Amino acid sequence: MGILYSEPICQAAYQNDFGQVWRWVKEDSSYANVQDGFNGDTPLICACRRGHVRIVSFLLRRNANVNLKNQKERTCLHYAVKKKFTFIDYLLIILLMPVLLIGYFLMVSKTKQNEALVRMLLDAGVEVNATDCYGCTALHYACEMKNQSLIPLLLEARADPTIKNKHGESSLDIARRLKFSQIELMLRKAL
């Protein structure tokens, strides 16, 4: 089921209902930046939570503010980086892997889609070093998730690997603690 939102446009963005998102923004362009009364999510954050690239692209063309934060002080970039495969994605990958590597291609396709989403947000001017209520940046989360495809994108956008979260850990510290040596090397090169 997922999350239920009090703002219809947020629910539509979360559920990938492009028609509804389009209708709400057409009615009033300020709906592109409306914040849900429950958790402060914007339609852009809702779409990024689920990786809905088409809706994100549409909202960005309608001047959605990429730097608005929700109650956890997270931007859309935090959620785009934290986006994981769904249970259904994993199930399809496992079931289709033996069939001409279709599962592998599905996995690669989903990963590329997430990279495109993050690149879109970076190109739109999202603050790459924005911290959430835990003091974590998108780079912290990318390191925790061992996301070797997003880390170079974030570093290229000038993500700071030395920012410490509220636990006193930088992205580099996280990579070191989790023994992600390739990520640690990437971060060291960025210093």
Swiss-Prot record:
Repeat (ANK) residue spans along the chain: 39-68, 72-100, 101-130, 134-163
Keyword tags: ANK repeat, Repeat
Xref: SMART domains: ANK (SM00248)
Pfam families: Ank_2
Keyword Repeat appears in the UniProt entry: yes
Protein name (record): Ankyrin repeat domain-containing protein 22
